[in-house]
């Protein structure tokens, strides 16, 4: 169903209306492999139709993400920031550009990106660009006036400084070997309530010892674990619904696993999840982030980024340093491309020392 470009009198309300429609469309087109409760997704779709403020849209998108539509915030945050920019600019300026959606052009979007993405990482800036391109491409296809004509923006954002350049090889934040040992000790030392102690310690240790992604760990099921010859083989459902297996020495987690499985029997577990809250639902990535950050602070190891993904980088760095095998890193982490794994060669101390010693050779 197509809609007039400007149904309402206020251009900021019209912009919000289109953002809501686009986000609803994205909710139906994003990967739903992590969705466990379809009813929650239906609720979100219905609420997106009714949302009449940016705060309501933000709330619904968070709910959709928690329901398993993990990529929705990649679009929601930039677009709601653009709505904020458009609304503020309309109030404090007398420029006619903000009196109609038809006046939105590349210049305005470049100004928005310049103001709102300063200090953000290149990857985040690219997400802003992708979200804007997605929105205006959607509007191009979905708007139609009473004469069945559409207003076409044809936004490309090809010449935006700092957004189109190559991402380069930014070194990921990680813990070195000694710091990882300290972090592991802190997992056991930090105080936790009896109900979550075994669960949280088990969850975080599995991530440390395998390097799996946080959402992969949160979706693990008991049937994914096989014990043989003192090792657990863990079947992981990764990106693109691709499966891979990792191995973990049983002694690292065995006592915690037994303790948690006893506690877990008290909960109405849904979908055979290994890790769940007291309602039986999956834990959120936000909760996991807070728990990891709490342990990092306790250990005195605070970094720029303190979530579970840093533990993944730490595992990969240590794996490459000890084995010097990029294929092994790629397979263990589930990277689709070897180039993604190549970043960890920058942490190869042996190679760096060899480079530094060339001036001492005859």
Swiss-Prot record:
Disruption phenotype: Deletion blocks difH recombination. Deletion mutant shows impaired chromosome segregation, slight growth defect, UV and ciprofloxacin susceptibility, resistance to oxidative stress and inability to colonize mice. Site-specific tyrosine recombinase, which acts by catalyzing the cutting and rejoining of the recombining DNA molecules. Involved in chromosome segregation. May contribute to chromosome decatenation. Residues 170-357 form the Tyr recombinase domain. GO terms for biological process: cell division; chromosome segregation; DNA recombination. It comes from Helicobacter pylori (strain ATCC 700392 / 26695) (Campylobacter pylori). Residues 43-140 form the Core-binding (CB) domain. SUPFAM superfamilies: DNA breaking-rejoining enzymes. This is Tyrosine recombinase XerH. Its main location: cytoplasm. Belongs to the 'phage' integrase family. XerH subfamily. Pfam families: Phage_int_SAM_6, Phage_integrase. GO terms for molecular function: DNA binding; site-specific recombinase activity; tyrosine-based site-specific recombinase activity. Keywords: Cell cycle, Cell division, Chromosome partition, Cytoplasm, DNA integration, DNA recombination, DNA-binding. It comes from the Bacteria. The active site is at residues 213, 239, 309, 312, 335, 344. It is found in: Cytoplasm. The keyword DNA-binding applies. FtsK is required for recombination. Signal peptide: none annotated. InterPro entries: CB (IPR044068), DNA_brk_join_enz (IPR011010), Integrase-like_cat_sf (IPR013762), Integrase_catalytic (IPR002104), Tyrosine_recombinase_XerCD (IPR050090), Xer_N (IPR041308), XerH (IPR033683). The gene is xerH. Disulfide bonds: none annotated.
């Amino acid at each position: 169903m197509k809609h007039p470009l400007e149904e309402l009198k206020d251009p900021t309300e019209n912009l919000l209306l289109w953002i809501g429609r686009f986000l609803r469309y994205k909710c139906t087109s994003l990967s739903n492999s992590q969705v466990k409760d379809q009813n929650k997704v239906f609720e979100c779709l219905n609420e997106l139709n009714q949302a009449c403020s940016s705060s309501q849209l933000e709330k619904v998108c968070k709910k959709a993400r928690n329901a398993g539509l993990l990529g929705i915030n990649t679009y929601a945050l930039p677009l709601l920031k653009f709505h904020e920019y458009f609304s503020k600019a309309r109030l404090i300026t007398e420029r006619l550009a903000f009196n109609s959606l038809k006046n939105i052009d590349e210049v305005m979007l470049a100004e928005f990106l310049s103001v709102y993405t300063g200090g953000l990482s290149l990857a985040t800036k690219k997400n802003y660009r992708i979200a804007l391109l997605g929105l205006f491409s959607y509007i191009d296809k979905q708007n139609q006036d009473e004469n069945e004509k559409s207003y076409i923006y044809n936004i490309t954002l090809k010449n935006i400084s700092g957004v189109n350049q190559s991402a380069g090889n930014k070194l990921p934040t990680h813990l070195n070997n000694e710091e990882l040992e300290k972090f592991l000790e802190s997992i056991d030392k930090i105080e936790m309530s009896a109900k979550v102690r075994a669960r949280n310690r088990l969850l975080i240790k599995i991530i440390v010892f395998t390097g799996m992604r946080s959402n992969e760990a949160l979706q693990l099921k008991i049937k994914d674990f096989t014990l043989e010859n003192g090792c657990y083989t863990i079947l992981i459902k990764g990106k693109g619904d691709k499966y891979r297996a990792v191995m973990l020495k049983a002694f690292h987690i065995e006592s915690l696993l037994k303790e948690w499985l006893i506690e877990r029997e008290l909960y109405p577990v849904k979908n055979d999840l290994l890790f769940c809250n007291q309602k039986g639902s999956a834990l959120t990535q936000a909760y996991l982030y807070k728990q990891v950050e709490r342990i990092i602070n306790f250990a005195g190891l605070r970094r720029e980024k303190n979530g579970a993904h840093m533990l993944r980088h730490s595992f990969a760095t240590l794996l490459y340093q000890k084995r010097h095998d990029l294929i092994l890193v790629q397979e263990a982490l589930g990277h689709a491309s070897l180039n993604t794994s190549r970043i960890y060669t920058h942490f190869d101390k042996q190679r760096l020392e060899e480079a530094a010693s060339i001036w001492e050779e005859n």
